[in-house]
Amino acid sequence: MSSVVVVGTQWGDEGKGKITDFLSEHAEVVARYQGGNNAGHTIVFGGVKYKLHLIPSGIFYKEKICVIGNGLVVDPKALLEELKYLHDRGVSTDNLRVSNRAHVILPYHLKQDELEEASKGDNKIGTTKKGIGPAYMDKAARIGIRMADLLDREAFKEKLEQNLAQKNRLFEKMYDTEGFSVDEIFEEYFEYGQQIAQYVCDTSVVLNDALDNNHRVLFEGAQGVMLDIDHGTYPFVTSSNPIAGGVTVGTGVGPAKVTRVVGVCKAYTSRVGDGPFPTELHDEIGHQIREVGREYGTTTGRPRRVGWFDSVVVRHARRVSGLTDLSLNSIDVLTGIPTLKICVAYKCDGKVIDEVPANLNILAKCEPVYEELPGWTEDITGVRSLDELPENARKYVERVSELTGIQLSMFSVGPDRNQTNIVRNVYEA
């Protein structure tokens, strides 16, 4: 039995999709365990670039089972659009499985998300307005509608009527806007459910059977540790748990069945949306990193904020996710910068801080303590081993591994699959 979890160690957008796609080649099953279609990942397969938001990266391998676990919230309309996107490009989706326990995003979740974000004014958290948060709210409040309900005409209508009575009061009384009628939603979304029905099953059984039969299972996280609702920069976070612990509740696979946890990070730091960002760059170097690294959101198109590599953040990710392996991406983006900086600690009110503060007022006041390293000018995009890296690039990579306390297993020097290099096999480690 071998199972590997891929976790983002920063604020998302670390290149998890590419690493998951790369590791998918040696897995029999690929599963997502949290989030929804708020997370975009770009994959290059067969020389073609694909942008996915909900379906696991392993979908391009028709012999591999791809699972959307119970921990996700699924917009049926968005899922069908993504299925069509793949079908139009000749990609089969017969290998997809969707949990019957996954919660469903409905039009009132999208509306609630938009209205709540607008009402916060300057205190907005930067939601993608995909209805993710409100759907998770309903799940916690025990009024959510699950995939199993969506497929049952009577159960779906009954739950929808109950929910709309409550949601419409919210829209009318709090936001002074019209709500929805049952007829507006019911037939359309019940039909979506019927189109998705062929994929829906108990995915916990699928995953545990695979592991019990010694198949390799890859768990694909979305977002990153710093966006985790418990361990991230709350409230500037997502509504689920991207950390490795999210696998257990989000798939129905026990923690003892997880063997390795790969932390994915970029050789610098980026984030979309609001919230403290200690190493953020507002200068020409920041602009260079953004443009060379194409730092624009896959889902929103928003320019990402960028900054120097923050080892405090990645050490935090190592601790809360139990990271066993490091995949360092986008090293090539730093080529040509004369002096590179790595944040080794924070300083606040004269005190050195080695951990990420829970209090965001303190984090906002933190100044990074930097260690400087010389850069390199050589083109490294064709490098295929650590030994081939220029001395300064190799020292930078080694220092990142030392400061984070995570063993380097993979590194990448460009966006293509063949630019991802294996230092050690995470399935056999």
From Swiss-Prot:
Keywords: Cytoplasm, GTP-binding, Ligase, Magnesium, Metal-binding, Nucleotide-binding, Purine biosynthesis. IMP binds at D13, E14, G15, K16, N38, A39, G40, H41, T128, R142, Q223, T238, R302. Homodimer. It is an enzyme of class 6 (ligase). This is Adenylosuccinate synthetase. Pathway: Purine metabolism; AMP biosynthesis via de novo pathway; AMP from IMP: step 1/2. It holds the Pfam family Adenylsucc_synt. Gene3D superfamilies: Adenylosuccinate Synthetase, subunit A, domain 1, Adenylosuccinate Synthetase, subunit A, domain 2, Adenylosuccinate Synthetase, subunit A, domain 3. InterPro entries: Adenylosuccin_syn_GTP-bd, Adenylosuccin_syn_Lys_AS, Adenylosuccinate_synth_dom1, Adenylosuccinate_synth_dom2, Adenylosuccinate_synth_dom3, Adenylosuccinate_synthetase, P-loop_NTPase. Plays an important role in the de novo pathway of purine nucleotide biosynthesis. Catalyzes the first committed step in the biosynthesis of AMP from IMP. It catalyses: IMP + L-aspartate + GTP = N(6)-(1,2-dicarboxyethyl)-AMP + GDP + phosphate + 2 H(+). Substrate binds at T298, T299, T300, G301, R302, P303, R304. GTP binds at residues 12-18, 40-42, 304, 330-332, 412-414. The keyword Metal-binding applies. One of its GO terms (cellular component) is cytoplasm. Mg(2+) binds at D13, G40. HAMAP family: Adenylosucc_synth. It comes from the Bacteria. GO terms for molecular function: adenylosuccinate synthase activity; GTP binding; magnesium ion binding. It is found in: Cytoplasm. Binds 1 Mg(2+) ion per subunit. The lineage of its organism: Bacteria, Bacillati, Bacillota, Bacilli, Bacillales. Its EC number is 6.3.4.4. Its cofactor is Mg(2+). The active site is at D13, H41. NCBIfam families: PRK01117.1, purA. GO terms for biological process: 'de novo' AMP biosynthetic process; IMP metabolic process. It comes from Bacillus anthracis.
